Swiss-Prot record:
Residues 491-785 form the UvrD-like helicase C-terminal domain. InterPro entries: AddA, DNA_helicase_UvrD-like_C, DNA_helicase_UvrD/REP, P-loop_NTPase, PDDEXK-like_dom_sf, PDDEXK_AddAB-type, Restrct_endonuc-II-like, UvrD-like_ATP-bd. The heterodimer acts as both an ATP-dependent DNA helicase and an ATP-dependent, dual-direction single-stranded exonuclease. Recognizes the chi site generating a DNA molecule suitable for the initiation of homologous recombination. The AddA nuclease domain is required for chi fragment generation; this subunit has the helicase and 3' -> 5' nuclease activities. Heterodimer of AddA and AddB/RexB. GO terms for cellular component: cytosol; DNA helicase complex. This is ATP-dependent helicase/nuclease subunit A. It comes from Staphylococcus epidermidis (strain ATCC 35984 / DSM 28319 / BCRC 17069 / CCUG 31568 / BM 3577 / RP62A). Keywords: ATP-binding, DNA damage, DNA repair, DNA-binding, Exonuclease, Helicase, Hydrolase, Isomerase, Nuclease, Nucleotide-binding. Its EC number is 3.1.-.-, 5.6.2.4. GO terms for biological process: double-strand break repair via homologous recombination. Its cofactor is Mg(2+). Coiled coil: none annotated. One of its GO terms (molecular function) is 3'-5' DNA helicase activity.
Length: 1218
């Protein structure tokens, strides 16, 4: 029983009902800004306070973890407040304890807890972990590799047909992409295999094909009838004209055709497919114009109606009936086995992927849902015993953002709720008009089905409550939004009727100052009048709107009833995507306005990130021209376009630019300076390649950053803080990647490529807080749930993305899979019945979701809403005004063929302000007759860019004469003096800039060796090219023998951890020790065969091992960084102030004396007659400089004499001479 609402409460009647109604399933349709979160919290509190329900017996499901934390905090706060008011209430005391066990979480979190408690039902290891994003992406890719490999081995005829249709000559990327899409679609269903198995049914069953034909017929009929009306208008106008017999003859022919085509309830598809238009409509010549003087506009209008008719019929012919019905149905039969085989491949992927995850003991988010469902259901799909216990435990289940659930989540909820809809305990809150996550497999039809089934009385099934009062926005925003959607959204296009229950009602305590919505149409300047593109012009125009807000607008404080000046943080720019972000950033920078792109996209497009990725791709495989040349052209290596052209010209027919570099370097006519530059570049590449063989990706990135001062350089540019954060972000992602079960540069690059392909960005690293005074740009998706005083909704002229509609395979969650028919023999593809039908359905659903995105964008605004669209000329605006009207809405065909949001928005809002529009193209004759809730309050402004632009066109490439330059500088002696001082300045520490600030001991060794030979070391370094040919890429190499330097690193790793004890290690114990290194992942398992066991045993059996084992203290792999001045005994006035860094293999202390040991895996040639002493002297001489630095460094640090040994595994111990 709902309690009587007191007069002094803040809740509306609908909110009050939402808080207290119970006894059946309840769906609360909460419009934007209607206070649904407050209602949800209050309902939880009242269930605790009024009904004595324990908080841990409520299951509250939110959409995000952040929402869950905020919800839990609010509930906890309210419980504490109630407890303070009634300190003796034991029930409230218990709630303060139980709140910590309360199930207020995302559904994924609930599923995870369920699995942790009932893992025994699933027969899985309880110590499972959640896979990282990188791990999951790469493992799925690997699984698809394996499954396709199996099918390539079988070469089933249907598989061959699929590969012929879905793969290109170069790769099978499209085929793989379709498999992945099908995988994600299928697992969004409670029974993925069942969903996949039914995909082929429409291709086999005639009754299903008839249903598809009827669906196509119904859609095509809409366009044909609209075409008939356009043709009739054309006929009526031409009938009033003189000398238009030819035009009327054509129109009469078309009238006969379309009358025959649309007679009856079913279209005559044969007539449509066979119909051919005249190649050209008879021209409106000067004779006709003279005969109809003063009626030129009517002539043009008549022709426009005919053109519109033709375009509508052509759409039907091309999109729906390009082939006759018999051909469409015959192709379905031939496609059936092909579709069934594709479904089988996806089933194989699901099974194999599951096995791969189990072998690694990992779960992903889809596993959470499906494993939870296995726990909660029996084999027949009925609720399990465990589900019954949860039903008994939870008094109520509350679901937030219900419009964003999918079929799997719906099934989980149905298992743990009690009763049927008329007596259940499920409370759902959401707004289907804000369902904008179809790309995540959210299914708004679940909400719509319940919305239509439930009633406001709740007598027949569940109870439906509409929360429509908006407490966020001014009246002008709400009424204009209502007017727009009442004429744009219905069940046909939009999937829900925007009726009185769905519309927004004003509820915020604003003053009565008018703030009309601004609908701004920017007419582009031509290329003759502006150097800027249309997008750049729009960005500048938006800046002007921001300036106007800051200079002239105020923000109303509803609590105090006072105004304050608008600030930058009050303003948000909303767009469909981040495509315009770069232009906006530049425009705001040019005007010194603080601006931040709140981006979850665009990370990989950042200059600094692209540089690092080009570097990584080049290191992995320099035979990729785009990345190799990109790296060469970058700020790091600074090759000019002229130099690159010079390299290419020498051997223009090389397959790869890397080959051109090699050929250029040996060309007799090559520029020696360019060859030197190339040598340094190649040396760098090979150095990093060698490093990447033994080090993880994040260390390779870190080395690149340090070697080339990448962080420092980008930090000094505009936006340096964000750039630095982006670089560190990539490094951190590489660290995360290494923590997965995948390793190596190739796999990391593959992970990045997958993220890019999926348009799943890391997001630019956010360096701006919520209170920073900046103008923000964000996508509509990321703005959901937020509000701003001023919203500039721009980019309205950007076309809807209908690219997926052109794919050879169309997927729909409800209907299944539509595949084009591909004739293998003719190598030609044709639309099939299924692909035509599902393409039309998806187009309709796409427009519906775009409408919902418009709704979300408009309802973010509190004070004022500014809509910005862009057109080439004003003729487009007239065309939008004239969109056909059907009853109270824009005609269905106009909505389905709309190319962008601006067509719809301007087409609705401009009609009532157009003085010349005929009544049949209006919604009403007088908007003043409308009630306040739907009366549009909109100011339409048409601006030509030339009229509003402050752009100053400056050509920096202008060639000026000496005389002009002299004239500019005449009489400006002070400037001349300052310029001379700047240009002639001599840096006092120039020598130091020629030397690195930090050098390794190995680098110093090479430098001193060359300088002692009277050779410049920098010159020598240019020619350290290494191997002449490039190895095969890693992914093409089956087995690979380790190089000498890799074996050296491996031996050092073994020695680093080698235990020293007086009872020497046996050979078996050494093998056990190496196995432990493998278990700890310190070395790879396949490395075991490359470890020189006998050489290590020789060391263990030798005297040096025993001396170390008996030492007082032993330190291994000791790093050091020391000032070279101190090591070399220089004075502080000496020019070279470099820092030396290095790593000493082992140091031990015996009786107060320190010794260091450096292991060497060098091979050497014993010439005939050479004694051991001669070989020893040769080896000591080779490492004399390095050992001297080691000893001097240790003596500098320890302040005492130090002795040292070189240990050669192939020779033995050598003591370092004093």
């Amino acid at each position: 029983m709902i309690p009587t609402k007191p007069h002094d409460v803040i809740w509306t009647d609908a909110q009050w009902q939402s808080i207290y109604a119970k006894g059946q399933d309840i769906l609360v349709a909460a419009a934007a800004g209607s206070g649904k979160t407050a209602v949800l919290v209050e309902r939880i509190i009242q269930r605790i306070l009024r009904d004595d329900v324990d908080v841990d017996r409520l299951l509250v499901v939110t959409f995000t973890n952040l929402s869950a934390r905020e919800m839990k905090h609010r509930v906890d706060k309210r419980i504490q407040e109630a407890s303070f008011k009634d300190p003796n209430n034991e029930h409230l005391k218990n709630q303060r304890i139980k709140i910590h066990q309360a199930q207020i979480s995302t559904l994924h979190s609930f599923c995870l807890k369920l699995i942790q408690q009932h893992y025994d039902v699933l027969d899985i290891d309880p110590h499972f972990r959640t896979s990282s994003e990188a791990e999951n992406i790469l493992l799925l890719e690997q699984t698809i590799d394996d499954v396709l490999e199996q099918h390539y081995d079988k070469l089933d005829p249907h598989f061959i047909e699929l590969t012929e249709q879905l793969s290109s000559d170069r790769n099978d990327d499209q085929f793989r992409s379709i498999i992945k899409q099908l995988y994600f679609f299928s697992i969004a269903n409670p029974q993925p295999f069942e969903w996949l198995n039914q995909l082929a049914q429409p291709y086999k069953e005639e009754n299903k094909q008839q249903q598809l034909m009827q669906l196509i017929n119904d859609l095509a009929m809409i366009f044909m009838k609209a075409g008939y009306e356009e043709l009739q208008k054309s006929y009526d106008l031409f009938s009033m004209m003189e000398s238009v017999d030819k035009q009327l003859e054509v129109i009469e022919t078309e009238r006969m055709f379309i009358t025959k085509a649309i007679e009856g309830k079913v279209l005559n598809t044969d007539v449509i497919t066979q119909h051919e238009f005249m190649s050209r409509f008879p021209a409106i010549n000067s004779k006709i114009k003279e005969a109809n003087e003063g009626m030129e506009d009517a002539l043009n209008e008549a022709k426009q109606h005919y053109d519109k008719y033709k375009s509508l019929v052509m759409k039907v012919k091309n999109d729906y009936f390009s082939r006759n019905a018999e051909d469409l149905q015959r192709d379905m039969q031939q496609l059936a086995p092909r579709v069934a085989y594709l479904a089988q491949i996806v089933q194989d992927v699901i099974q194999s992927f599951g096995v791969q995850k189990r072998s690694r003991n990992i779960l992903d988010f889809s596993d959470y849902e499906h494993f939870a469902l296995r726990i909660l259901t029996n084999e027949d799909g009925s609720p399990s015993r465990i589900a019954e216990t949860y039903r008994e435990h939870f008094k109520e289940i509350l679901v937030d953002e219900y419009q964003d659930t999918n079929r799997v989540q719906e099934k989980i909820l149905s298992c743990i709720k009690t009763g049927e809809e008329h007596d259940g305990n499920l409370f759902m809150v959401g707004d289907v008009k804000q369902s904008i996550y179809k790309f995540r497999q959210a299914d708004p039809s679940l909400f719509i089905e319940k919305y239509n089934r439930f009633s406001s009385s709740g007598n027949e099934s569940g109870l439906r409550i509409d929360l429509s009062q908006n407490f966020r926005s001014r009246q002008e925003v709400l009424s204009t939004t209502n007017y727009l959607f009442k004429h744009m959204m219905d069940e046909q296009v939009g999937e829900i009727s925007y009726d009185d229950a769905a519309q927004l009602y004003f509820g915020a305590p604003y003053d009565e100052v008018s703030h009309p919505v601004q609908l701004r149409a920017l007419v582009e300047a031509s290329s003759e009048n502006s150097d800027l593109t249309g997008s750049e012009q729009e960005a500048n125009y938006i800046v002007e709107q921001v300036k106007d807000i800051i200079n002239h607008q105020n923000v109303y404080d509803m609590k105090t009833g006072q105004y304050r000046k608008a600030t930058y943080k009050d303003i948000v720019i909303l767009e469909r995507s981040f495509g315009q972000a770069r232009n906006l950033q530049q425009a705001f920078k040019n005007n010194d306005i603080p601006f931040h792109v709140n981006s979850k996209e665009g990370y990989f497009e950042q200059t600094e990130v692209r540089l690092v990725l080009s570097f990584l791709r080049t290191i992995d495989n320099p035979l990729q021209d785009i990345y190799l040349v990109g790296l060469m052209r970058s700020v790091i290596y600074q090759f000019t376009e002229e130099e690159l052209a010079e390299i290419r010209v020498v051997s223009p027919h090389d397959d790869y630019f890397y080959q051109s570099i090699k050929n250029y370097m040996i060309d007799e006519k090559a520029d020696s300076r360019l060859v030197d530059k190339l040598n340094r570049f190649i040396q760098d590449i090979q150095k990093y390649q060698n490093y990447s063989q033994s080090q993880p990706v994040y260390q390779l990135i870190d080395k690149f950053y340090n070697d080339h001062f990448v962080i420092q350089y980008f930090s000094g540019l505009i936006g340096g803080k964000g750039r630095r954060a982006n670089l560190y972000g990539l490094f951190n992602k590489a660290v995360e990647f290494e923590n997965s079960s995948f390793r190596g540069l190739f796999q990391f690059i593959r992970f990045i490529d997958e993220l890019i392909d999926r348009k799943k960005d890391f997001g630019e690293e956010n360096v701006v807080g919520p209170n920073d005074n900046v103008v923000r740009m964000m996508t509509i998706h990321s703005s959901k749930g937020l509000e701003f005083p001023f919203v500039i909704y721009s980019g309205l002229s950007k076309k809807f993305n209908k690219g997926d509609l052109n794919a050879p395979v169309i997927l729909n969650q409800q209907y299944g899979l539509g595949m084009d028919y591909f004739d293998v023999n003719k190598d030609m593809a044709f639309p099939s019945l299924a692909s035509v039908a599902y393409r039309a359905i998806n187009e309709k659903e796409l427009i519906s979701e775009e409408m919902r995105l418009i709704y979300v964008a408009l309802t973010r605004a509190k004070e004022q809403l500014i809509l910005v669209g862009r057109v080439k000329d004003e003729k487009s605006l007239i065309k939008y005004e004239q969109l056909a009207v059907s009853d109270t809405h824009i005609a269905v065909n106009e909505r389905l063929t709309a190319t962008n949001p601006f067509v719809l928005i301007y087409g609705v809002l401009a009609k009532h302000q157009s003085p010349s529009l005929p009544n049949d193209q209006r919604f009403e004759r007088d908007i003043d007759q409308l009630n306040s809730e739907v009366k549009p309050r909109v100011s339409i402004v048409i601006d030509h860019y030339e009229d509003v632009s402050t752009e100053e066109v400056v050509n920096d490439n202008e060639i000026r004469t000496i005389e002009e330059l002299k004239a500019i500088n005449t009489g400006n002696e002070d400037v001349k003096i300052k310029i001379h001082q700047q240009l002639s300045y001599d840096y006092p520490f120039k020598v130091n800039t020629m030397k690195p600030s930090k050098q390794s001991v190995s680098e110093l060794k090479r430098q001193l060796e060359t300088e002692e030979s009277n050779t410049n070391y920098d010159r020598v370094r240019q020619y350290r090219i290494g191997v002449a040919s490039y190895e095969r890429p890693k992914f093409l190499t089956q087995t690979k023998k380790r190089k000498a330097n890799e074996i050296g690193t491996l031996m050092h790793t073994v020695m680093q951890h080698l235990p020293f004890r007086e009872q020497r290690l046996t050979k078996d114990e050494l093998f056990q020790y190496i196995d432990r290194l493998i278990d700890k992942q310190l070395i790879d398992e396949d490395a075991k065969e490359d470890i020189r066991i006998d050489e290590i045993m020789h060391f263990i059996d030798g005297p040096l091992y025993m001396e170390i084992a008996q030492a007082d203290n032993v330190y291994t792999e000791l790093p050091f960084v020391v000032n070279q001045i101190k090591v070399d005994g220089l004075t502080s006035e000496d020019e070279d102030v470099s820092i030396i860094q290095g790593m000493i293999d082992l140091i031990y202390e015996s009786d107060g004396q320190f010794y260091f040991v450096d292991y060497k895996t060098d091979a050497f040639n014993r010439r005939k007659g050479m004694s051991d002493e001669e070989i020893g002297n040769q080896l000591k001489e080779k490492y004399q400089i390095q050992m001297t630095y080691y000893r001097n460094t240790l003596e500098t640090i320890l302040k005492r004499p130090v002795k040292g040994y070189l240990y050669f595994f192939k020779f033995g111990t050598l003591e370092i001479d004093d």
